[in-house]
Amino acid sequence: MLKDVLFALWFFLPAGIANVTPILVAPLPGLRRLDAPIDFGLTFRSRRVLGAHKTWRGLVSGVAMATLTLWLQQLAVGQYAWARTLTGSVDYAHLPTVLLGVLFGLGALGGDAIESFFKRQRDVPPGHGWFPFDQLDYIIGASLVTIPFVALSLRQYALLIVLWLVVHLIASYAGWLLHLKERPL
């Protein structure tokens, strides 16, 4: 069971990193020029499509960090025995790292954007939680777009969802304690 838990954490790390990156890079002044909303301010039914919090800065940085994370994982698997024990049945040596890293990032942030669309349509203010959708959006998005390259068993997906849900809750609370987020959930 421990091996399965470690695999789920290792395998999905690029998506988890993509999901948290926009929050971490928000205060960086060098990326402010990318601080434009990806919905271009458009509305649907008199409500913003995604809102001002979904920016090009977050999308670009999240996708870049997911790709970098997967590349570092691939290097680690090639160099270190401890990393090879985390890979399960996934052959990291033959993964299309750049493509899959981009998909992890786009899937995670795309899932988050889709969930934001529904939050806006339900009048949930930006920054306010919408449990459990806020915690599952990136997991579902990244899982769906990576299936053509790495298909896991239903048990592995279930474990992945539960573990990363818990990781997300802990990270959100930590972000709130560190004043990176306005609300704990």
Q: What residue spans do the PLM features occupy?
A:
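Interhelical loop and helix-boundary elements at the membrane-water interface
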Residues: 1-144, 154-185
